[in-house]
Amino acid sequence: MTADADTGMVHSMDESEPNPIPVARHRWKKLRATAVVLATQVAILAAFLGFWDYMTAQNRAAAFMFGSPSAIAGFLGQMARDGSLWRDTYVTGLETLLGFFVGNLVGTLIGLSLWYSRFVSRVVEPFVIALGSIPIIALAPIIIIWFGTGLISKVAMSTLSVVIVALVTSYKGAVGVDPDQINLMRTLGASKFQIFRKLVVPASLTDIFAGLKLTVGFALIGAIVGEFMSSSEGLGHAIFKAGSLYIIPKVFAALVATIALALILTFIVGKIERLLMPWRRL
């Protein structure tokens, strides 16, 4: 309740205005929970690295077989100084991004379009299962013969690693839409395309973005496998070359860069998800 200073009349507050106190408390609890999770993760990682470094310092054979965190950090610094870290990360990142984009675009469009026809989806299903069961590394020699040893072959490997997953997750989201909502739109006179555009696609976004996060790793694996088979640059080439020379710490250094790249790409996908689906922030 508020009082008017001039008239002395009492006015009630607008009940539609949100109370900032519960909102602030909710945000604080969420921030505190995130901080606790992050602190726990850092503690576990620090304990693991400390144990790893101690064991390799006590045993030369273990140091040769597994490297050590200090040696890995040394190789990371060396690779950063000579520029190979940034060059290889850029190459692998470009291949991964292109494969991620093309694979998800094609897979999502096909997956959503299968919602239109139950007959077509039943016809296509065994072929999708068959393609999804093929190990991507088995296709590498064929891809190299078709597209050569350059960028296109790595992008093709990355795309093939992604497309089936994107297709399945988007189709799952489309067919999982509440039938009652579809029937309601039909009774209101909506066409099939309007139902698809205004209901099916928005309702499928949760599954689509879950697939996007999952396919970041698949796209990166496809690019790395392509670099294993035939490449003179990239993180996959760095891992393969260091492994063939038994430089285990350098292998782990390149793996650390690969993990960092995957985390960055996943973080970007998460930001885009929260931008397009603001209700997911709650």
Label the model's feature ranges:
Residues 1-43, 267-282:
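Transmembrane alpha-helical segments of polytopic membrane transport and secretion proteins
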Residues 21-22, 26-30, 57-102:
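Periplasmic/extracellular loop-to-transmembrane helix junction in inner-membrane transport proteins
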Residues 85-89, 93, 123-130, 170, ...:
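Hydrophobic alpha-helical elements at and bordering transmembrane segments
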Residues 98-128:
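Transmembrane-helix boundary motif in ABC transporter permease subunits
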Residues 118, 175, 206, 252-282:
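C-terminal transmembrane helix and the adjacent membrane-cytosol boundary/short C-terminal tail
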Residues 126, 169-214, 235, 239:
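Short cytoplasmic-facing helical segments at TM-TM junctions of multi-pass membrane proteins
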Residues 129-165, 172-173:
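Generic hydrophobic transmembrane alpha-helix motif, especially the helices
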Residues 156-160, 192-226, 253, 257-258:
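Transmembrane alpha-helices
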